Amino acid sequence: MAPNNKKIKGKSNVGKGSKSKKGQQTRKTPTLKQKLHRESKVVKAESLNWKTVEVPDNLDDWEGFYGLEEIDGVDVKIVNGKAEFIVKDNKKVKKGKTEEQEELEDDEEQDEDEESEADEEQGEDEDEDEEHEEDKINEENEDEFEEEEFTGFDDDSEIQDGMEVEDILDEDINEIGEVDESVEPVQESKPEHDEELSENVFQHSQFVLPDDEDINLPHWQNEDSNFSLSPYTLHGLSVLGFDKPTPIQKKTIPLAAEGKDVVGKAITGSGKTLAYGIPILEKYLSNLSIINQNRQKKIINHPTGIIFAPTRELAHQVVSHLNSLAKYSPLSTNGIVSITGGLSIQKQERLLSHGPGIIVATPGRILELLQKDEDLTKRLASTDIIVLDEADRLLQDGHFEEFETILDLFRKNRPKNKTFPWKWQTLVFSATFSRDLFGKLDKNQKSHKRNSEGSSLIGNDEILNLLNDKLKFKDTRPALVDANPKEIVSGNITEALVECGPTERDLYLYYFLLMYKGSTLVFANSIDSVKRLVPFLNNLNIPAFAIHSSMIQKQRLRALERFQKASEKNDTAVLIASDVAARGLDIPNIDHVAHYHLPRSADVYIHRSGRTARAGKEGVSVMFCSPQEASGPLRKLRRLVANNSTKGGRLNMHNDVKLLPIEMDLVSQLKPRVIIASKLADADISNTSTRKEDSWVKQAAEELGVDDLSDLDDFEDDIIKKQRKRKEGKMITKDEKKGLRYELKELLSKSIRKETRRSYLTSGLQNIAHQMVTGVGHEDVVGHSKVNALDDLKGKKVARSKAGKVTKPSQKKQEKKQKKQERKDTMRKQKEGNRK
């Protein structure tokens, strides 16, 4: 390289001979043409690094494509009828031609450009010559730097823990794009480093084994057995702040670690994810030496555990929770992957090709992958553990045929040798395991005798036999764990009822959201209701977001992210959801769950209500119920869900569920707002649906060759006509919409006042002036103190006097009611004893 460099310098010095001392002057920036010359190179076709095109085997003959070659990343320019190939990447050029020769050609072209410009501006040409000289020197230094840099990887190279060189290259390829296979990898220049690197994958691991003295988690050590968690897991639990295991975790983790099949039941929000996640992680760590040996032999490892979830959102949530725990273990970054619908199947195939340790999947997408790849089926069939999260869905007939097909494929393709046990370990978890909870609430079904243990899993042979028929447990009888045998709904959830008419749900929902600040999750039975409630609440200046099954996966995840951000910024944030968000989702800091419609079955109600009061916190579950629902479905729901303390006696619904206190003077002031907001929301939905129908009808008419659309009215069904007329009746013009929006804006600008007849701030029972000064007044209701739904329902509501002092209400009325109830119970028991 040195002789060529001297030639370049000599050439540049010639142009410098007649130059005066201008080195100290400011240099001008290079022209666009000079920049293009430096960035790109013109090469010949035979100098390019062509790739051979692989012709598919299904072609009988080559059809003129024999020896076809291709290349990408090269620009073609036609100059004087000839094609010139312009290259910006040196990898696209064969190594036969030296880089020094290419630089000389570029320098000659740049010198020619400079000579052509010298006649016009000689002074600028001298500056540019000086600039070219320094650029050439810089290019020489860069070439020398590149030669020193790309001599291979040193021993001190930092490799991401738990990953091979191939994994790192795969990630680089995905970030940069498609890489030419004919270009030799850079690290091949020093093969001895590659061999050493592949033999010592975890030699430079950042995961130093934590010191046992630094970890103080005595509650996680099981004194009854010799089982103990690894330091990696204990370190992760310590960092996450999980000092004590929950009851379900304390009972199931030792059993699962012994390799037993486990069926676990616990209330919502009790930590079931870690109850099965920790045993899988411990199993992976115990097999770490075998996993590393397989990596050195270029063998793809089979997964340690496969977790099946009923919904996509739950699968992504499980991955997030397990990653937060496994972050402090040797499990690689791609060691836990989610395989769900709605996302790129090619990316999921690539993730599975790396042999992840834990797979969290929905049955539909993973079945699609298994049917495409037989090798993948054999590898996944070798798994050690299979987990069913929210497994109560399997008890319902007609659900999850895909899951049963997956199990059949695993049984047929599981290796039959001494290396693998003949059957995998099965872990089953859910919050509901009673068949009575799955019946429709609006249908009259035969009354089943309630078990003496209520909803307890222990001794429930019917559920156990049903699970065994579908799952084929490894053990003759799996270990049954019921952390809450007497609880169906979590004791931290306060249930409430709002009695309203069928057409007044919007009004009372708005009242609830306005009065009680916080993040609220509203469930509706239909997707149309979800779509209507979002614009309705947005019109009332309440941030609302929607999630339902008709949305694609990215839209659902984006809606959840926006809701969480809105709940952090604003006092009130609402997520309107269908039952797709009812199971398993752990959305942080949900204060209230509102049932806009009464759920269709009791198990859905349990899982809906379980979205609040998670991880030991308290929450409120409110039902908006019409008189028609109260007479039938609500009574049946309360009979199934009520605490076991009321068994054997007559169910008093008002004692079981508390009525939410409603102030009718405030409701009457909110009604005009709700009417206008509802009209605007209905108009938006009607306009959108009618526009879609019209476009569909026009497209169908064009395909049928019908010119006059009125001819299609004769073939339209009567029901469709009624629906169309109903939608058209809700449509309004643009001027009417503007008028309604202006009217609603005026109403929202006016404050709601308690006891509106008062004219002075200091008059009445509430001292408004004192509330405004101290900041204890309600933000949206003048003359009303701040309220909390949990305190109001638990009887902690306080009365504030004119001076602002707090006084507790008397409890004599409550004590009288309790005494009367006790007398009635004793009289009833005496009568039953006399009859016997």
From Swiss-Prot:
GO terms for molecular function: ATP binding; ATP hydrolysis activity; RNA binding; RNA helicase activity. Residues 100-133, 140-160 have a biased composition (Acidic residues). A motif (Q motif) lies at residues 222-250. It comes from the Eukaryota. One of its GO terms (biological process) is rRNA processing. Residues 1-49, 89-160, 792-836 are annotated as: Disordered. Residues 253-451 form the Helicase ATP-binding domain. A motif (DEAD box) lies at residues 389-392. It is an enzyme of class 3 (hydrolase). InterPro entries: DEAD/DEAH_box_helicase_dom (IPR011545), DEAD_box_RNA_helicase (IPR050079), Helicase_ATP-bd (IPR014001), Helicase_C-like (IPR001650), P-loop_NTPase (IPR027417), RNA-helicase_DEAD-box_CS (IPR000629), RNA_helicase_DEAD_Q_motif (IPR014014). ATP binds at residues 266-273. The keyword Metal-binding does not apply. It catalyses: ATP + H2O = ADP + phosphate + H(+). Residues 822-836 have a biased composition (Basic and acidic residues). Residues 508-665 form the Helicase C-terminal domain. Its EC number is 3.6.4.13. Disulfide bonds: none annotated. CDD domains: DEADc_DDX24, SF2_C_DEAD. Keywords: ATP-binding, Helicase, Hydrolase, Nucleotide-binding, Nucleus, Ribosome biogenesis, RNA-binding, rRNA processing. Residues 1-10, 796-821 have a biased composition (Basic residues). The keyword Transferase does not apply. ATP-binding RNA helicase involved in the biogenesis of 60S ribosomal subunits and is required for the normal formation of 25S and 5.8S rRNAs. The Q motif is unique to and characteristic of the DEAD box family of RNA helicases and controls ATP binding and hydrolysis. Belongs to the DEAD box helicase family. DDX24/MAK5 subfamily. This is ATP-dependent RNA helicase MAK5. It comes from Scheffersomyces stipitis (strain ATCC 58785 / CBS 6054 / NBRC 10063 / NRRL Y-11545) (Yeast). The lineage of its organism: Eukaryota, Fungi, Dikarya, Ascomycota, Saccharomycotina.
